């Protein structure tokens, strides 16, 4: 990608700013004695007096909640009524994804909703916005709130963990719907989404206060843009939570097809029963305010994806299934469904800013994206080819449903698929819950009743939606067409052009317009096709 000199100056200015801030931080470490706490207090007050609109506008919790969703903080488990989160974020795959420009005072998303009444009111918290008096703890909170030492390998693992999710289960189904030539769409989306991921970096480097995807929307289109971007991102997370419920119901019912329950005249077959049981099982995890432990477990998402892929290849190449189907070259009638499925595979742009700003060497971000997209695309393509070759036109929306039940590799793949969403469900739904909790009036905001009510309502609603539309592949296609296209192909170029404006070269303008056009066309066609298929299935 060719950039003008003015574009590159954005990187230079940002890096210089980072070095200057690091130098100032080093000075504070050298001279930071208890006698200097008053100076730290004055500096903090000066910073707060000039608070950026990006840090005070809704959703203030986005940064930290997505950090938890996309990375692995230190384990410190607590329920809504009594939880606190250590700011020292150790990680299985990365350090805490925290913006290097992040202000000292961050919105509290892991703070207990119900304060300890016995705690002294003047006690300074690492999350407090206005400390009552200077103290040495202020210096501690400053040091503990910023971390950007993620290595190249750690950043790549985070990128793969974000990109390679349940979408990999449906790539064989996508080939079935679109034919072999439809795989071209997968590779095309990979290239376009990689490029738009780079555009987000330019937007982040345009101003030190621009830290998250909603901040980018704010910088590009004002508060309206911020709200629009946030709502789209939260809708996608909510829809992913619905997919987890459907996924659990489908896979558990395939292992226990005779399970059923009749209560008061209501009969629940196996998929609905397991969807209900899954919701009841994950509900307590949704009530957790600090999801660090779940983050550690869900960090195995990369391992789980690799394990499931290996099981598929083992069943196909070593066990008795083998390659039986030549498949269809092109299926134009249902190709739009595969467009949404392939689009869903690259839904990670909401977390890319966090990964970028956590890196010790941000200049390596392009290589991180390239490695992450390359690894995931190879995995997607490999699973798509192997799965469709094995099962042909009988390929289900999740290839795990096609695996022979009597094989050990099949059982490993199924149970891995079943266990993984139990940890990811709460991490996926919590950002949505936290954003809604921000809307609670301050005099009610500390009551855990409202938080539990919001989170329970969200969880129950995902169950109801999953029961009403229990079509995993079609729902995924709808998400990929309607929401993911907006997040990955339409909004990044639009924000890039709006923020950088005169600094953008004519070539970049042309490329951005082309990408937005492709995204818009795919979104309209894919959304219409997915909705039509869903309505058709509901009426049969």
Curated annotation (Swiss-Prot):
Region (Disordered): 1-55
UniProt GO BP: amino acid transmembrane transport
Lineage top rank: taxon: Eukaryota
Location relative to the cell: Membrane
InterPro entries listed in its UniProt record: AA_transpt_TM
Keywords, alphabetical: Amino-acid transport, Membrane, Transmembrane, Transmembrane helix, Transport
Residue ranges, compositional bias (Polar residues): 1-11
GO cellular component, one term: membrane
TM helices/strands, residue ranges: 155-175, 180-200, 227-247, 273-293, 297-317, 332-352, 367-387, 412-432, 452-474, 478-500, 511-531
Topology versus the membrane: Multi-pass membrane protein
Protein name as it appears in the record: Amino acid transporter AVT1B
Organism: Arabidopsis thaliana
Gene responsible for this protein: AVT1B
């Amino acid at each position: 990608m060719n950039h003008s000199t003015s574009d590159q100056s954005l990187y230079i200015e940002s890096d210089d700013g980072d070095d200057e801030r690091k130098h100032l931080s080093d000075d504070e470490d050298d001279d930071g004695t208890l006698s200097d706490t008053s100076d730290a207090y004055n500096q903090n007050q000066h910073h707060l007096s000039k608070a950026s609109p990006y840090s005070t506008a809704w959703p203030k919790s986005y940064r930290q909640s997505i950090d938890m969703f996309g990375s692995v903080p230190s384990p410190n488990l607590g329920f809504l009524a009594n939880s606190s989160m250590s700011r020292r974020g150790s990680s299985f795959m990365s350090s805490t994804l925290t913006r290097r420009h992040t202000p000292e005072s961050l919105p509290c998303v892991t703070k207990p909703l119900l304060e300890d009444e016995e705690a002294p009111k003047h006690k300074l918290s690492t999350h407090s916005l206005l400390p009552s008096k200077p103290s040495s703890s202020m210096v501690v909170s400053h040091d503990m709130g910023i971390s950007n030492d993620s290595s190249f390998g750690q950043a790549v693992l985070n990128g793969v963990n974000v990109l390679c999710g349940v979408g990999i289960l449906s790539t064989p189904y996508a080939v079935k719907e679109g034919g072999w030539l439809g795989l071209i769409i997968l590779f095309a989306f990979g290239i376009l989404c990689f490029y738009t991921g780079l555009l987000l970096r330019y937007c982040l480097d345009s101003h030190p206060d621009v830290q998250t995807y909603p901040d980018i929307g704010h910088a590009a289109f004002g508060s309206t843009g911020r709200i629009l971007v946030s709502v789209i991102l939260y809708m996608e997370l909510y829809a992913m939570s619905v997919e987890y419920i459907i996924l659990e119901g489908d896979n558990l019912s395939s292992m226990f097809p005779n399970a059923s329950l009749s209560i008061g005249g209501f009969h629940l077959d196996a998929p609905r029963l397991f969807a209900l049981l899954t919701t009841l099982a994950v509900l307590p995890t949704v009530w957790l305010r600090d999801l660090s432990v779940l983050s550690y477990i869900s960090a195995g998402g990369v391992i789980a994806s690799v394990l499931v892929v290996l099981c598929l290849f083992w069943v196909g190449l070593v066990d008795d299934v083998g390659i039986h189907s030549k498949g269809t070259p092109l299926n134009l009638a249902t190709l739009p469904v595969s467009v949404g499925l392939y689009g869903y595979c690259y839904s990670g742009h909401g977390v890319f800013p966090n990964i970028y700003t956590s890196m010790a060497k941000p200049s390596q971000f392009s290589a991180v994206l390239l490695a992450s997209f390359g690894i995931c695309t190879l995995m997607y393509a490999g699973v798509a080819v192997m799965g469709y070759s094995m099962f042909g036109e009988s390929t289900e929306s999740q290839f795990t449903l096609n695996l022979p039940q009597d094989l050990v590799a099949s059982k490993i793949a199924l149970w891995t698929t079943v266990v993984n969403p139990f940890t990811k469900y709460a991490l996926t739904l919590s950002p949505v819950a936290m954003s809604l909790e921000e809307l609670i009036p301050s005099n009610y905001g500390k009551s855990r009743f409202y938080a539990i009510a919001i989170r329970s309502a969200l969880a129950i609603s995902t169950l109801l939606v999953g029961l009403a539309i229990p079509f995993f592949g079609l729902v995924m296609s709808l998400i990929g067409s309607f929401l993911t296209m907006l997040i990955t192909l339409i909004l990044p170029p639009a924000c890039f052009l709006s923020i950088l404006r005169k600094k953008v070269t004519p070539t970049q303008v042309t490329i951005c317009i082309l990408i937005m056009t492709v995204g818009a066309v795919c979104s309209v066609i894919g959304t219409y096709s997915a909705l039509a298929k869903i309505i058709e299935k509901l009426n049969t």
